[in-house]
Regions:
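A solvent-exposed, acidic/Ser-Thr-rich amphipathic alpha-helical stretch
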Residues: 1-60
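Juxtamembrane/interface motifs at transmembrane-helix termini
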Residues: 17-19, 75-76, 109
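Residue-level detector of functional hotspots within protein domains
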Residues: 30-32, 68, 75
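Extended, polar beta-sheet/loop recognition surfaces of beta-rich domains
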Residues: 14, 104-109
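Beta-strand elements of well-folded, non-transmembrane domains
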Residues: 59-65, 82-84
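Short, cysteine-centered beta-strand-loop-beta hairpins and adjacent loop/turn segments enriched
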Residues: 62-72, 101
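Short, surface-exposed coil-to-beta transition loops
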Residues: 39-41, 73-78
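Short beta-strand edge/turn micro-motifs at domain boundaries
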Residues: 54, 75-105
Length: 109
């Protein structure tokens, strides 16, 4: 992530330190009770324009919680923007868009 990067995930986080703190909080609160995680990132759609790029990538993350044994099925979309500065590519923006799956239907079917 560039120092002026932005993350849209559980709020808006600007700057590398704020982004790191967001991920650390998520890992400590949401990831810690999970075991057997399968994080699958699909083929990204990439739009390259000089020193800037945009991508969209679908993601599946499936796991079991330790205490309840409940299966967790997460589907998301990563919308990313990258910038190349001084020959190096880094994230300029990441938006994590949660998506519903067939397993979250309100009617339970």
């Amino acid at each position: 992530f560039w120092e002026d990067a932005r993350l849209e995930f559980n709020g808006t986080h600007v700057g590398r330190a704020a982004i790191r703190a967001c991920y650390e909080d998520w890992i400590n609160t949401k990831r810690a009770p999970v075991e057997g995680l399968r994080h699958m990132i699909y083929m990204p759609l990439i739009d390259l324009d000089g020193d800037h790029a945009r991508t969209e990538t679908y993601v599946d993350a499936d796991a079991h919680t330790r205490r309840s044994g409940r299966t967790v099925l997460l589907r998301s979309l990563y919308r990313d923007r990258f910038a190349k500065r001084n020959g190096e590519w880094r994230f300029l923006e990441r938006e994590i868009v949660p998506m519903r799956s067939l397993y979250d239907r309100e009617d339970g079917n």
